[in-house]
Amino acid sequence: MATSLSKILTRSNTKRYWCSTTTSISASPSLPKQFWSRHFSAVADSSSSSSAALGSQSSSSAPPQENKRGSKWSQLLLFLPGAITFGLGSWQIVRREEKFKTLEYQQQRLNMEPIKLNIDHPLDKNLNALEFRRVSCKGVFDEQRSIYLGPRSRSISGITENGFFVITPLMPIPGDLDSMQSPILVNRGWVPRSWREKSQESAEAEFIANQSTKAKSPSNEPKSWWKFWSKTPVITKEHISAVKPVEVVGVIRGGENPSIFVPSNDPSTGQWFYVDVPAMARAVGLPENTIYVEDVHEHVDRSRPYPVPKDINTLIRSKVMPQDHLNYSITWYSLSAAVTFMAYKRLKAKPVRR
């Protein structure tokens, strides 16, 4: 449009100039005709060049609107990484507050008085209400069917020692109302490798002695319902004098979720690398729905006789603690500030040098 207007104006100006010039030629016939022809051609060339320059200037001064839209979107995309990292930092702050509430809830539950699992508090009715509650279980350990979970290491005075967690069935005491009404599995704590070897030797010797005694004097005692699941007889009144009853204070726990780097359990060879409660219960001849309890103590003395139970404070620890969430949030916020600053510097107009 601007180009056509410039051409029209140029033509009108040229015509006016021609008219005025022809009038001047007629008025002054002394100048030759060759001079006026050269003069007219120069004027025409200058007018055409000026119109072309005007058209190009008008076309370059008006960029397409699509380029403006594209530049706005590209500018917004530069700030997108900063917005994402800022959101991740805020999410870590929220997770930190949630972790504080979870750990506080667990601490309050663990500080409550232990619940006695006896005839008044059967296990099958209170499992959902016993989350992170200490329970008191009275019974007799069946040492011959202990399971060793490991290897597990512990550090004492900077020295690392390998060992195992020993898991033993705790059997009810017949006729005792304070005793449990069904057997459970108890994680009694950590033992060294040498303790495991000695325990297995003594268990084998005791098993042979029991088999010989059983062959000489068969028992006519009535069988309990869990006798059908058990590989060895249930504890009877005659065994109570030889085996001392114990009372375990622990917390009901579930199985573990192993990572891809943990080997699979092999019950046939007695190799257990992670807690699988149903499989362990089957291995010792108990029902698959047997309860698994971890023996816990406050302020555990590491020099006490084996097994060494778990410290109760380990139950209120998590793989990611609140301090870790705070560190993650600081990292994300720092990254957000860095990428936002780089985007600002990229869009900031540079001063023109003269």
From Swiss-Prot:
| Entries under InterPro entries matching the protein | Surf1/Shy1, Surf1/Surf4
Q: Where in the cell is it found?
A: Mitochondrion inner membrane
Record's GO cellular component, any one?
mitochondrial inner membrane
GO process terms (BP): embryo development ending in seed dormancy
Decide whether keyword Transmembrane helix is in the record: yes
Please give the function described in this protein's UniProt entry: Probably involved in the biogenesis of the COX complex.
Q: What is this protein called?
A: Surfeit locus protein 1
Q: Which organism is it from?
A: Arabidopsis thaliana (Mouse-ear cress)
Q: Organism classification, top ranks?
A: Eukaryota, Viridiplantae, Streptophyta, Embryophyta, Tracheophyta
